[in-house]
Amino acid sequence: HQAEHSDLIAAQHNVSDQIKVQDTELFLDNLFTEEEEPELDIYTEGWDSQNVNCYRNAVVPQTKEINVSKFAMPCPGYMTSPYGYRRRFRRMHKGVDLKVQIGDTIRAAFDGKVRLTKFERRGYGYYVVIRHTNELETVYGHLSKFLVEPDQYVKAGDPIALGGNTGRSTGPHLHFETRFMGYAINPSAIFDFENQTTHTDTYTFDKRTYENAR
């Protein structure tokens, strides 16, 4: 009986340890990826009469090599929330969140032309969309102030806005997206946010990877 009792206690400890590990993994996953509800997608929600996604009916190539050698980091802050599906909200987070303080300078990631500077109360708050010469578009959300206007040309590194906490946001941060013909590319596939650089000088877009991210 003593041996059986010892085995039972050991088994209970094992189950308890497994639950603790699973709970810890779930907690960390939720802490890192689900701390904030993803923004309603300005490219698909249809609220913008100016057609934020002007590529809706365009034929998108299966693959495309994109030159990202001439770049600037949008801000020096670290990543607080990655790109990816949010189980709790059943919605994609189609960009990354980067730590900023209100008033921090936000910079254009590549050369290009400002397409939109708008306000969207349900998600992005004050945001900027830039169409770049390398055919990417970038989106910068939750801003506090615009430093550029639509149709203005900018160079990589030019100040475009100040960081903020507008729209659906629980604290100051920059929501940053990279898009190709309407498809939301994982910014971390292009940028190494930890080391403040790009992974390579050329990024290869593969349509199959992002079929659910348009």
Predicted features by range, described:
Residues R91-K94, A108-L147:
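Zn2+-dependent peptidoglycan hydrolase active-site motif and core
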Residues I106, G112-V114, D151-G163:
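A structural signal for short beta-strand/turn segments enriched in small hydrophobics and glycine
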Residues R122, G163-H175:
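Active-site loop architecture of trypsin-fold serine endopeptidases
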Residues E149, E177-R214:
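Acidic, glycine-rich catalytic/binding loops that coordinate metals and/or anionic ligands
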